[in-house]
């Protein structure tokens, strides 16, 4: 008997051991490095602070089920990078476009449509990516 919790594309303001996708995008843009972002793929970014609150609830209210603790919306990596640039006043012209097919060429394939939803999560309102970025701005 166990709880299985699935998360998707976690991101946060600080974690020095490993950069997540948000901090990687932000770092590239801050250092004026161009990025080629996928336009025809979807991801579900999840703010780690929300995951922590959701896990606390699940630990205190055990039920042997599968839960998805994921962000409130999904978007393309291109749109995610555009939002990072917008929220942190970085240069959007550094963000180029590519397709999923072109990006995974000669690489290990990634899921093209990672559109996971929190159907059973009626205990904690997960943030959208834009709301998560607003909170990160306050934390930085």
How would you name each of these model-derived features?
Residues 1, 17, 47-50, 60, ...:
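Catalytic phosphate/metal-binding cores of nucleic-acid and nucleotide-processing enzymes, i.e., regions
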Residues 1-43, 50:
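NAD(P)-dependent short-chain dehydrogenase/reductase
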Residues 3-5, 67, 96, 127:
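Hydrophobic/aromatic beta-strand patches that form the interior of the parallel beta-sheet core
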Residues 17-23, 52-53, 82-84, 111:
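Short, glycine/charged-enriched secondary-structure capping and boundary segments
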Residues 49-57, 134:
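Amphipathic alpha-helical segments that line or abut small-molecule/effector binding pockets
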Residues 54, 61-107:
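Mid/C-terminal beta-alpha module of Rossmann-like enzyme folds, strongest
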Residues 76-82, 99-140:
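Conserved C-terminal active-site "lid" loop/helix of NAD(P)H-dependent oxidoreductases
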């Amino acid at each position: 008997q166990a709880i299985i919790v699935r998360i998707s594309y976690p991101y946060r303001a600080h974690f020095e051991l490993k950069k997540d996708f948000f901090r990687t995008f932000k770092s590239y843009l801050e250092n004026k490095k161009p990025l080629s972002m996928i336009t025809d793929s979807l991801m579900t970014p999840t703010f780690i602070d929300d995951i922590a609150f959701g896990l606390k609830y699940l630990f205190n209210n055990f039920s042997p089920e599968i839960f998805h603790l994921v962000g409130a919306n999904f978007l393309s990596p291109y749109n995610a990078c555009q939002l990072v640039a917008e929220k942190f006043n970085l240069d959007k012209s550094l963000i180029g476009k590519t397709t999923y097919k072109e990006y995974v060429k000669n690489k290990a394939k990634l899921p093209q449509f990672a559109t996971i939803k929190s159907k059973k999560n009626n205990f904690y309102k997960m943030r959208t990516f834009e709301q998560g970025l607003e909170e990160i701005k306050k934390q930085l």
